Amino acid sequence: MDEKSKLIDRYYDRYFESYFRRFINSFFRFNALPVVYTLGIKYLCNQKLRYMIIETKHLIIRYFQEKDVAGLLEYLSHPRVNCFVGDRLCSVESALAYISNTPKDMLRYAVCLKEDDFIIGDVFALREYTDTFSVGWHFNQRFEGKGLAYEAATEFLDYLFCDAGARRVYGFVEDDNLRSKRLCKRLGMRYERCMKEFISFVCYPDGTPRYEDTCIYAILNKEWTEQREQKPNSLGLCRVVTDMHEMNEKKQ
């Protein structure tokens, strides 16, 4: 292929990419995700969401990078609650796999300090239906007591409702996980019920399963909107949402 043909191909590739991104953005802007799913481009929508970046007063919530491995190992080498035993990372290789092998229906982001981009946790959401997400989070114990988990979770929920088309967001919380229960309440999530001995993640010393009492906390889009209108920008957040393509274009 000669140089002229290569330039023409490159032009059409960039034109198509730009056009397609505007096409997808229009669905997000008008909250038409059910139509998007019907058209069969759910995976492409999740790919767009996956590369979003949220900037708050103290944090950057972004897609994972290889430099996050050390920070990931710091808080996931010894998960503090039983439900995340399966996420335990024991090596650099397992941390790299955690970063690169995010399920297609899951959104998972690194929560990093704005001052030095060091990862202190992550937030994630699994799309279970077109407009329903199950959420969760990990945070480094070393950074507790500063309101950072609340800041990250607040903006993540706002992102799910405003940008990802969520109608309902809920989370499973073990009954003895007091930190997450307090966080859910502070976020305005409604306690719905507690399922006794719902699931087992670990065993007792004698090998018998230890079943956990599991609570459900949830909130609807309309409840979140009403709550945010009553206390607009209560954290003093400077929320900026962008995506990887826009960042690269700005750098160029």
Language model: regions and residue ranges:
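Acyl-donor (CoA/ACP) binding surface of acyl/acetyltransferases
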Residues: Y43-R80, C112-Q252
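A short, aromatic/hydrophobic, helix- or strand-capping loop or linear motif
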Residues: F84-L89, L107-L113
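Conserved GNAT-fold acetyl-CoA-binding loop/helix
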Residues: R80-N101
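A short helix-loop-beta-strand connector motif used in the catalytic cores of GNAT acetyltransferases and
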Residues: I99-A110, G121
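Basic polycationic patches enriched in arginine
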Residues: R10, R14, R21-R22, R29, ...
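Short hydrophobic transmembrane-like helices used for membrane targeting/insertion
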Residues: M1, I8, I24, V35-V36, ...
